Amino acid sequence: MRLFPIRSFRRHAAVSGALAAVVIAASCETVPYTGRSQLQIMSSAQESQMGVQAFQQTLAKSQLSGNVAASEMVTRVGSRIAAVTGHPEYQWEYRLIQDDKQANAFALPGGKVAVYTGILPITRDESGLAAVLGHEIGHVVARHGGERVSQQMLVNIGLETAMASLSAGNPATVQAVASLLGAGATVGVLLPWSRAQESEADHLGLILMAKAGYDPHAARDLWVRMAAASQGSGRPPEFLSTHPSEPTRIQQIEVWLPEAMQYYRPR
């Protein structure tokens, strides 16, 4: 049984493909250090504005830590790394959020950086924190936020084309196929790209922390501790995860360490 008219599908696919090709050709940029070509439909200013809004929303529902020494450490380490990014135009901000159950940190477009107190026992010292912030600021340097928005826009074009082609079919069939298309886009396109971005942020993070005067070997040690902390956490398999597994990260870091050490100058 035919689910949708072949001619209609081909027509929509041709239009969608042509539009996507034009967008990609006009919106390619190169990631610093890695040299990877990436799709960037939105401007850096637009991306930064999104980061500012998200940062404000997060802080509005969070409690900042009262630990002055730890907060100063976050600012000190973050500032050293930010100074070597080549982005003085960003309005860099650093916050330590009080949440001992959250072993996490993030950096948003425009230079908005936050660390949760729950990750400090794992980072242990400034070098460990530099490994975390180098990774998070690596996302900012590589403009991964804008890239993910751009990728989602292309995925939406593809899904809309497929749904338009299915519109003449049985409603129940259309709904079932639409669900499969959405799942396929998530597993087959968005998550793999996210894992690639996470790995790239690891790569960039090593270089950034080294340029800031932190020994990049601390990143390997950090992920060994992170692997121990995550055992028994019930995390999803790597195939369905937006982050590479800790063993994969450690192996990749070992490969990148010689390159990062070329940038390392102890302070």
Where are these regions (language model features)?
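A Zn2+-metalloprotease active-site environment signal
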Residues: 3, 12-16, 23, 28-267
